[in-house]
Amino acid sequence: MNDCAYQTVTNKLTDYKVGRGKWNLEVTKETVQELEVTYSAPAAMPAIEQNLIPKKDDTFVQFGNFGSIKKIIQSRLFYPTFITGLSGNGKTFSVEQACAQLGRELIRVNITIETDEDDLIGGFRLVDGSTVWHNGPVVEALERGAILLLDEIDLASNKILCLQSILEGKGVFLKKIGKRVDPASGFNVFATANTKGKGSDDTIHWN
C-alpha cells in the first residue's frame, strides 16, 4: 500500500516526463553518410508500341451505311462523322471492321457521364515515385493519325467540351505541359449514339 501513496506516485511520474521531439539515438558516421546519399527515382518505362488495327471478323456482313463509313476512312480526310441508331445494331462494329479491312489503326473510347478531360486528353500519373505525363486516347490518336471512335457519346456531360478544337480539326494544346499536338495525316473522329440528341439532322442513321 505504501508504494501507492500519493507522494510516491507523484515522484515516479516526475522522473518519467516526456520531452517533445527528444530521442536518445546514437548516430554513427556511417549512418550520416547513408542519409546523405541522394535518392534518384527510376525513369518511367517507355510506352510499348502496339498494333491498333482491329482484327477482321469473317462473320461480318456489310449492311446499311457501311460503304459510306469505309469511303470516309479510306479517304484519309478529316471528316468527323456522327452515327446514330438503336442499341446493338452494329454501329461500333461497322467502324471497327472498316478499319480492319483498310488496315487503319482504331482507338475506341467508351463515353460515360463521368468521362472528363483527364480520361480523354491525359494527365499526370504516379510512376515509381515520380509524376509522369501520360497521353490520353485522344492525344494518342492525334499523334498516330488513327481513327478515334467515341462510343455512346450521347451519355457524356459537358466535361467533354475539351474536344471542341479537336472536332474542328485544329488539334489541342496540352496546357499542363505546355505542348501543342496537331493531328497527323489520316486522323478522323467517329462518334456513335443511340439517340440523335437535339442538334443537326446531318448524321448517318443506322437502321
Question: Language-model segments: what does each one mean?
Answer:
Residues 2, 6, 153-156:
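Alpha-helix N-cap/helix-initiation sites
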Residues 3-40:
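Charged low-complexity interaction tracts in eukaryotic proteins
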Residues 41-207:
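AAA+ P-loop NTPase catalytic core and its hallmark functional loops
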